[in-house]
Amino acid sequence: MTMNIRRVLRTIAISGLWVALFSMTVEAKTKVTSESFGKMPDGAPVEIFTLSDGPYEARVATYGGIVVSLRVPDRNGKPADVVLGFDNVDGYLANFNGPADAFFGALIGRYANRIAHGSFTLDGRKYSLPLNNGENSLHGGPHGFNNVVWKAKPIANGVELSYLSKDGEAGYPGNLSAVVRYTLMKGDLRIEYSAATDKDTVVNLTNHSYFNLAGKGDILDHRLTLHASRFTPVDVGLIPTGELKSVASTPFDFRKATAVGARIHADDEQLHRGRGYDHNWVLDTDSGGGKLGEAAELYDPSSGRVLKVLTDQPGIQFYSGNFLDGSIKGKGGKPYELHSALCLETQHFPDSPNHPDFPTTELKPSQRYHTVTVYSFSVR
């Protein structure tokens, strides 16, 4: 192991020690178990961890760090799985390596969302990335963090996943040591991301869970609130134009709770380009100093389930399941139809490495990447 890689791992280990010391002061109430979830094509085992806290249950796989299922009670106390996915690792392997990769429930890296033409310049050097979304690189390319097996260990109230992305992997510079911690407590699924590098690089991590709070049907009647006065318009390739546009008097104004389907078919150029909503909103919450702010709220009137999204990130991608067309058969062989779920992906803005005016995603060896997102469930 090279000296640089040792230094990166040491940085992550020290940060992990502080988390462990803090966790020792918190009573662990969530039951954490693990079992086999299948095997990779090369025979490598894949585990699935089950986090159980009363009526709440999350299952997380070591392949792709996938949130495989998330069971949440409705207003009558009846639980249902509120995320899309597959019954076993074979389903994810087929989807993630096929032409209709939907990234169901997966950890996304090294760079969430799109990078135009699969290239960016850092410190005067141009880097080229594999293309997997037309002329662009999407969610780290065809061999991103969703398509690797993470090392895992149980921690208080959850599971810790770690992965070393080597220098040059998927075209990105630097040995990047990433650690992601999933914890479940009292209806809060907390995702904590950390990373360190031995060379200047770019990092933007998120989770790509598809939510349907009813556990069935479509999400067009879900009420969505986004705490954002601006969004980033996109070109025909869904790459930000660089403009930060006001949502006022547009179908993108979700500052007050609005049904997802209320304006999704409006005659709007941006909606036409995304075939619905597939855009980044610029959050109004102050993310300075790592403080968590409420980014979004989703409410399903039929079940009473409420999802609040809290984050310290500057943006959130709202994707309304526009490319689901029934061709993908998910859990129990159920076809995932148009708008059968939506994504709320906390993030830095798409294509930030090519937009100097956007919040930076650069990470230096002297820095530590750290961000937290909480998906908080309740009923109304």
What are the residue ranges of the model-derived segments?
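N-terminal amphipathic/basic-hydrophobic helices that include classical n-h-c signal peptides
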Residues: 1-2, 241
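Bacterial N-terminal signal peptides that target proteins for export
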Residues: 2-15
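An exposed, glycine/acidic-rich loop-and-rim segment of catalytic or binding clefts
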Residues: 29-380
